[in-house]
Amino acid sequence: MITQRISKLREKMMENNVQAYIIPTSDFHETEYVCEYFACRKYMSGFTGSAGVLVVLLDKAALWTDGRYFIQAANQLEGTGIDLMRMGQPGVPELDAYIVENLKENDTVGFDGRVMNTKDALAYKSVFDLAHLNMNVNLDLVNDVWTDRPELPSTPTFHYSEKFAGESMESKLSRLRAFLKENKVDSIVLTSVDQIAWLYNLRAHDIPN
């Protein structure tokens, strides 16, 4: 099943002139735990751990994960044709170095930029530019392969009771404003969903418990 999905992904890669495709474990907000709609790395690799990045080339594939998941990943990747890259271990290349080593000048690296944080994307770009590789950041190729992909959830938000939150929204905002004033800051921009949910005591059910 995994090998068939990888084969279909490679077909889409060739259609889009992409020689390497990166699939991180993330969503549009870089949430630590993602809903099933964003479980692209799990779908394409069969690896169910919470952390890992899959890279698919036209002739090989590899998955990077940390020490928490070495045994699990080795078991789940068996027979898939995906090599396990044990992060931090001797002789294991960095993801970008692996891509550079296996691609040639003017080849293209693709990924869905909506689920890649800016810091990582810029770091990749600096390495790929030196190797004269192109980047296409507007490709959700997994969506073309995952024909029964779950719908993007949109559950209603609700106010989390102060009884359980331990502090009211008004109190949190007051403390935040006092902190900003103390540090001579006019405003703050929050983009992390969990920070916003905590500050305003908001919750939803997009991600199952």
Language-model features: where?
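Terminal domain-start leader segments
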Residues: 1-209
